[in-house]
Amino acid sequence: MAKFDAHLKCSFCGKSQEQVRKLIAGPGVYICDECIDLCNEILDEELIDSQGGSRQGAEPSRKAGAAQARKSTKPAPTLASIPKPQDIKAFLDQQVVGQEAAKKVMSVAVYNHYKRLAWQGDGKGETEETATRLHKSNILLIGPTGCGKTLLAQTLAEMLDVPFAVADATTLTEAGYVGEDVENILLRLLQKADMDVDLAQRGIIYIDEIDKIARKSENPSITRDVSGEGVQQALLKMLEGTVANVPPQGGRKHPYQDCIQIDTSQILFICGGAFVGLDDVVQKRMGRNAIGFMPTEGRGRGKATRDLQAAQVLRHLEPDDLVRYGLIPEFIGRMPVSAVLEPLDEHALESILTEPRDALVKQFRTLLSMDNVQLEFEPSAIEAIAQEAHRRKTGARALRGIVEELMLDLMYELPSRKDASSFTITRAMVEEHTGGKVLPLPGSERQQESA
């Protein structure tokens, strides 16, 4: 057999197999070693040119980025700059209606947390007093949907002027499974801080729906619970305080990237959840049936009554009850501060509509004032909106949906009306679920006749 086949040639330079050292075959094509070397040289030259240009262009941007980072980095809190618990609660009162016990608990916990940060970074010499290490106390909020758990955490971050990130525990899974890694929570906080690590390390993270990662039974299971107990295990070190490696582009879609290190020991974690059925666990532990907490005439009423009774039962909550519910003891130990939020009654919903700084009534008044229309709500209309929201049983979240539905026709018609300078919402409009049906529109009869 011949050593070389004269019919085989390089598809690029045309040299035969005899004229080159190596001829590599592909699907219907051939390439010689000389062409491969030439291709490598071309690629190397283009790579060097592109890197040189990027370096020249990136140098000023890097300097600008460093300057921006220095500009955005805020100094560490000092003892004098931290608001006192009473001041914190007074600020919460402006935004959150009710929940007095929860606001008091959170005010003290947040004050102690940032006082701890100031104590560690005050620059004093090492003494017997300053050598004492202060450990942080994360917060667990328990309450029905729409009672103000997220708003409490968000208002605290607004007052302290620190980055605030919200995460959903239901999307978290263990590493290696479909879903989000726990490190993505830190990435959201870092993004809120404009990638300023020092600022992010003084921020607040709120993890919602934390009750959804409770394991299905109190006893350990032989099957893998990747979104329940597994997530609790993954969150332990982050809650306690560790130096976590955070991929700036997300870890699963971009595995090959430099990670940013964040120390979580200074981040305040607030976890919230509805914990449906937890009151039954407490009653079972205390050995009392429903009669012990609810009179006979109170049983059989609506969901609002049951939620109120559940909040009263949860005042006797102990850590062992959370273990029976499905949280592992190690996780509970890292959430030493807990607060139970009560369901909102009709009176509280009326206050939410009018009293807070960003109340819904004030928001819609501002919107219509831009169209030179003065909007008013009759007290009976406010009462009717609160009653409807209470009937829907979704807390304060129902208020916006009701008002949006009520204001749809008005906000469609009034901006085009030149003769409308004021408008009043009545109870009848609320009960009919629209303001447009009772709004007299000039020319509407002529439009109907022409139609």
Swiss-Prot record:
Residue ranges of domain ClpX-type ZB in the record:
1-51
GO terms (BP aspect): cell division; proteolysis involved in protein catabolic process
Q: Which NCBIfam families match?
A: clpX (TIGR00382), PRK05342.1 (NF003745)
Which GO terms of the cellular component aspect does the record hold? HslUV protease complex
Name-wise, this protein is: ATP-dependent Clp protease ATP-binding subunit ClpX
Superkingdom field: Bacteria
Which InterPro entries does its entry note?
A: AAA+_ATPase (IPR003593), ATP-dep_Clp_protease_ClpX (IPR050052), ATPase_AAA_core (IPR003959), Clp_ATPase_C (IPR019489), Clp_protease_ATP-bd_su_ClpX (IPR004487), ClpX_bact (IPR046425), P-loop_NTPase (IPR027417), Znf_CppX_C4 (IPR010603)
Its family remark reads: Belongs to the ClpX chaperone family.
- Can you name the source organism? Synechococcus sp. (strain WH7803)
Listed CDD domains:
RecA-like_ClpX
Q: What does this protein do?
A: ATP-dependent specificity component of the Clp protease. It directs the protease to specific substrates. Can perform chaperone functions in the absence of ClpP.
Binding residues for Zn(2+)? 10, 13, 32, 35
Q: Which HAMAP family match?
A: ClpX
Tell me which UniProt keywords the record has, alphabetically: ATP-binding, Chaperone, Metal-binding, Nucleotide-binding, Zinc
SMART domains for this protein: AAA, ClpB_D2-small, zf-C4_ClpX
Q: Does the keyword Cell wall biogenesis/degradation apply?
A: no
Q: Where is this region: Disordered?
A: 50-80
Q: Where does ATP bind?
A: 144-151
Q: How does it assemble?
A: Component of the ClpX-ClpP complex. Forms a hexameric ring that, in the presence of ATP, binds to fourteen ClpP subunits assembled into a disk-like structure with a central cavity, resembling the structure of eukaryotic proteasomes.
What's a single GO MF annotation on this record?
A: ATP-dependent protein folding chaperone
